[in-house]
Amino acid sequence: MTQPTLFIDRDGTLIDEPKTDFQIDSLEKLKLERNVIPALLKLKDHYRFVMVSNQDGLGTDSFPQENFDKPHNAMLEIFRSQGIEFDAILICPHKPEDNCDCRKPKIKLLKKYIDKKLFDPAHSFVIGDRATDVQLAENLGIQALQYHPEKLDWDLIVEKLLPKTTACKRPPRYAEVVRTTKETDIKVQVWLDETGVNQISTGVGFFDHMLDQIATHGGFRMNVQCKGDLWIDEHHTVEDTALALGTALKQALGDKRGIQRFGFVLPMDECKAECTMDLSGRPYFKFKAKFKREKVGDFSTEMTEHFFQSIAYTLMATLHLKTQGDNDHHKIESLFKVFGRTLRQCIKVEGNELPSSKGVL
């Protein structure tokens, strides 16, 4: 039967992967990833679980089968004891040089699920810590959640996979903005009272990742689709996306009744990023950050300030941002994350009063 399915990697995702030899070949090496059991318990009523793992040289002298079986079976017993079962456990025992057809990201291991159409492509995901897991998802035509114990842990994965709606008795705070110019064609959708998987595609990979940070740390869900004149450069794509996103956020907020309005976060991450925000209806922007590099990936560092300035003016917000550190990638990422965290405070609904003595925001 077709149903939502999670194809889950084992080493580095369900259990810790030792960086010394990348083998869990004894009970002493068996260690569950943090909060994996509570997460799977929350997900099990909504998804089928399928474990998919590459185990290099399994059954050879370099990795005897019995050395694998003891910790593997112990792990399964722990999961079973907590009510967690896997529909299938699919393992490729080959090494990369064997050039087999079943090693991830190839899809032969999942032939049954593909041929019998057992998974719902629109609501199925690959969860894993490696680039091969992301590629597996692409080969299956589904989405990937690249697990990371700090950036995308099991708690955040649950948030993305189990959208939550507001308990307040008010219409959902949703907005859709379409912005078309000679340079760009953009569609932005925001759901301020939901979390879930964000669909973001601008053609600028690093920028996509940064936009996802805003929604993830902002505690809301958004879709951003942009087709821009990237054969020139990414300027119009970044600027126009910011304008559309700011407009969508402003529209979704509606009359702003019950929101906190103010937010601040400091410091955040190793880069000491700081943000203060007021959804005042009066745009103002102040930015302090210096970058050594011209580009991070395919993203011009100078566009960081321009992005936030554009979003502040269409969101009609007072926004102060600054960061300092050594790594330009980390500094830019810290600004997007701290913006999301601060926005999360501002848009949180706590009642029905308008947070202004003027009676309007």
Curated annotation (Swiss-Prot):
Binding-site positions, Mg(2+): D9, D11, D129
Record-listed E.C. numbers: 3.1.3.15, 4.2.1.19
Region (Imidazoleglycerol-phosphate dehydratase): 173-361
Gene: hisB
Active site, per annotation: D9 (nucleophile), D11 (proton donor)
Record-given protein name: Histidine biosynthesis bifunctional protein HisB
Pfam families xrefs: Hydrolase_like (PF13242), IGPD (PF00475)
Keywords: Amino-acid biosynthesis, Cytoplasm, Histidine biosynthesis, Hydrolase, Lyase, Magnesium, Metal-binding, Multifunctional enzyme, Zinc
Pathway the protein acts in: Amino-acid biosynthesis; L-histidine biosynthesis; L-histidine from 5-phospho-alpha-D-ribose 1-diphosphate: step 6/9; Amino-acid biosynthesis; L-histidine biosynthesis; L-histidine from 5-phospho-alpha-D-ribose 1-diphosphate: step 8/9
Binding site for Zn(2+): C92, H94, C100, C102
Span list, region Histidinol-phosphatase: 1-172
Cofactor: Mg(2+); Zn(2+)
HAMAP family in UniProt: Bifunc_HisB, HisB
PROSITE patterns found in the cross-reference section: IGP_DEHYDRATASE_1, IGP_DEHYDRATASE_2
Molecular-function GO terms, alphabetical: histidinol-phosphatase activity; imidazoleglycerol-phosphate dehydratase activity; metal ion binding
Species of the source: Actinobacillus pleuropneumoniae serotype 3 (strain JL03)
Family to which the UniProt record says this protein belongs: In the N-terminal section; belongs to the histidinol-phosphatase family.
Gene Ontology BP, a term: L-histidine biosynthetic process
Subcellular location: Cytoplasm
A GO-annotated cellular component: cytoplasm
InterPro entries: HAD-like_sf, HAD-SF_hydro_IIIA, HAD_sf, His_synth_bifunc_HisB, HisB_N, Histidinol-phos, IGPD_sf, ImidazoleglycerolP_deHydtase
Catalytic function, reaction form: D-erythro-1-(imidazol-4-yl)glycerol 3-phosphate = 3-(imidazol-4-yl)-2-oxopropyl phosphate + H2O; L-histidinol phosphate + H2O = L-histidinol + phosphate
